[in-house]
From Swiss-Prot:
GO cellular component: chloroplast thylakoid membrane; photosystem II
GO molecular function, one term: electron transporter, transferring electrons within the cyclic electron transport pathway of photosynthesis activity
Assembly notes: PSII is composed of 1 copy each of membrane proteins PsbA, PsbB, PsbC, PsbD, PsbE, PsbF, PsbH, PsbI, PsbJ, PsbK, PsbL, PsbM, PsbT, PsbX, PsbY, PsbZ, Psb30/Ycf12, at least 3 peripheral proteins of the oxygen-evolving complex and a large number of cofactors. It forms dimeric complexes.
Transmembrane region(s): 21-36, 101-115, 140-156, 203-218, 237-252, 457-472
Membrane topology, from the record: Multi-pass membrane protein
Organism in which the protein naturally occurs: Lactuca sativa (Garden lettuce)
Role summary: One of the components of the core complex of photosystem II (PSII). It binds chlorophyll and helps catalyze the primary light-induced photochemical processes of PSII. PSII is a light-driven water:plastoquinone oxidoreductase, using light energy to abstract electrons from H(2)O, generating O(2) and a proton gradient subsequently used for ATP formation.
Keyword line: Chlorophyll, Chloroplast, Chromophore, Membrane, Photosynthesis, Photosystem II, Plastid, Thylakoid, Transmembrane, Transmembrane helix
Name of the protein this chain belongs to: Photosystem II CP47 reaction center protein
């Protein structure tokens, strides 16, 4: 036929059998990719340290999605929460991956069958004998089935009635585990960080989908609406489907980037706003203050801070720090975290406690400035030593560590003090292994950043696709110069379907 690459889809325009075939093949490709990617990630994933080397630091992309739906065990004998297990059952990570690959193979065979046997009776109009689809009826069927699946997920899987539940954690991502979730029917269900809203919204949306599906199965669209929205044209279906997909992509890009109950920080890493707002820093200070109020020493109070909480309070885990074209996992950037060195507290020679001003998200370099409790600058690492008044040497700054590996260790040597002041700009200080993966020391983004960028980009692309195909179907008669109500389309000597010699070229 000699079709240009951008017109190849016209081959399924009036061919319901092969239209179905290519969609089944698309499902085969998607499921096959998901299963294969899962097996690849499992082959390279190291589950040995869920605290300092979690899945999101290792650049895992599909493992977090499996985990949030209730998969936690591997046939390799490990659990995502740490420790070993003896009976992971069929629905392990490998089991889910295998199920996707088997499903992909079955879809592949089904696609071939439907490509060969495309001319089925079910696709032909009994009155005219031509291929035709009752699109409003198909819409009703699909809406009904989607509603059943949505309701079933919310009522059974999420609630644990028949299923594992979902991943639920505390606000600081410390105690996450898979558990059953009760639906939240009150106003709290609309809080994006309340897991109960996931159950209740799926139940409500599923019920609505079932009722809407039954409505569209039992009520025919009015003739004017049918013609006005071109409901008999498959390109109308394409346009509205693209609209649904791009809308969903925009929504999930938002819930991923800003955070929600569906994107736990234990699985996808913290959000940039948690760094910007000092979210974890405030909680750490609150816990230390509570410890001091219970007559604990500073060392004891800091030693009780979970390493996991301290690790979140490190700029290297901020997804906005990764550059656009920096491929690879976070571990390939600043290295694999080995241990928390402890919290450094700086003091000048007068005994005032000094705080290092933290680096904002979008800075690559930032001046080292130490302020006192009132925000007054007391020390810095000057750019021009000749004019300095607040240098570490002049002010006599010392540093002492509390908690972590250097608990109780203090330094007064200015070179060492400046080294730790620079590192304190980046949050809590960790020992990082850059040798194992030959990490280059340049920050990378987490899967949270990749997912957001990918979905926002494709959503924008699909938005234009919706406008394009919507305009084509609504204004087809204008573009073609032909009355859409003609018995057979006459597109100035061209076939209705390019390369199809059976299409009539004129009426009669």
């Amino acid at each position: 036929m000699g079709l240009p690459w951008y017109r190849v889809h016209t081959v399924v325009l009036n061919d319901p059998g092969r239209l179905l075939s290519v969609h089944i093949m698309h499902t085969a490709l998607v499921a096959g990719w998901a299963g294969s990617m899962a097996l690849y990630e499992l082959a390279v994933f190291d589950p040995s340290d869920p605290v300092l080397d979690p899945m999101w630091r290792q650049g895992m992309f599909v493992i977090p999605f499996m985990t949030r739906l209730g998969i936690t065990n591997s046939w390799g004998g490990w659990s995502i929460t740490g420790g070993t297990i003896t009976n992971p059952g069929i629905w392990s990570y490998e089991g889910v991956a295998g199920a996707h690959i088997v499903f992909s193979g079955l879809c592949f065979l089904a696609a071939i069958w439907h490509w060969v046997y495309w001319d089925l009776e079910i696709f032909s109009d009994e009155r005219t004998g031509k291929p035709s689809l009752d699109l409003p009826k198909i819409f009703g069927i699909h809406l009904f089935l989607a509603g059943v699946a949505c309701f079933g997920f919310g009522a059974f899987h999420v609630t644990g009635l028949y299923g594992p539940g979902i991943w639920v954690s505390d606000p600081y991502g410390l105690t996450g585990k898979v558990q059953a979730v009760n639906p939240s029917w009150g106003v709290e269900g609309f809080d994006p960080f309340v897991p109960g809203g996931i159950a209740s919204h799926h139940i409500a949306a599923g019920t609505l989908g079932i009722l809407a599906g039954l409505f569209h199965l039992s009520v025919r669209p009015p003739q004017r609406l049918y013609k006005g929205l071109r409901m008999g044209n498959i390109e109308t279906v394409l346009s509205s489907s693209i609209a649904a997909v791009f809308f969903a992509a925009f929504v999930v890009a938002g819930t991923m980037w800003y955070g929600s109950a569906t994107t736990p920080i234990e699985l996808f890493g913290p959000t940039r706003y948690q760094w910007d707002q000092g979210y974890f820093q405030q909680e750490i200070y609150r816990r230390v203050s509570a410890g001091l109020a219970e007559n604990q020493s500073l060392s004891e109070a800091w030693s009780k801070i979970p390493e996991k909480l301290a690790f979140y309070d490190y700029i290297g885990n901020n997804p906005a720090k990764g550059g656009l074209f920096r491929a690879g996992s976070m571990d390939n950037g600043d290295g694999i975290a080995v241990g928390w060195l402890g919290h450094p507290i700086f003091r000048d020679k007068e005994g005032r406690e000094l705080f290092v001003r933290r680096m904002p998200t979008f800075f690559e370099t930032f001046p080292v400035v130490l302020v006192d409790g009132d925000g007054i600058v007391r020390a810095d690492v000057p750019f021009r030593r000749a004019e300095s008044k607040y240098s570490v040497e002049q002010v006599g700054v010392t540093v002492e560590f509390y908690g972590g590996e250097l608990n109780g260790v203090s330094y007064s040597d200015p070179v060492t003090v400046k080294k730790y002041a620079r590192r304190a700009q980046l949050g809590e200080i960790f020992e990082l292994d850059r040798a194992t993966l030959k990490s280059d020391g340049v920050f990378r983004s987490s899967p949270r950043g990749w997912f957001t960028f990918g979905h926002a980009s494709f959503a924008l692309l699909f938005f234009f696709g919706h406008i394009w195909h919507g305009a084509r179907t609504l204004f087809r008669d204008v573009f073609a110069g032909i009355d859409p109500d003609l018995d057979a389309q006459v597109e100035f000597g061209a076939f209705q379907k390019l390369g199809d010699p059976t299409t009539r070229r004129q009426i009669g």
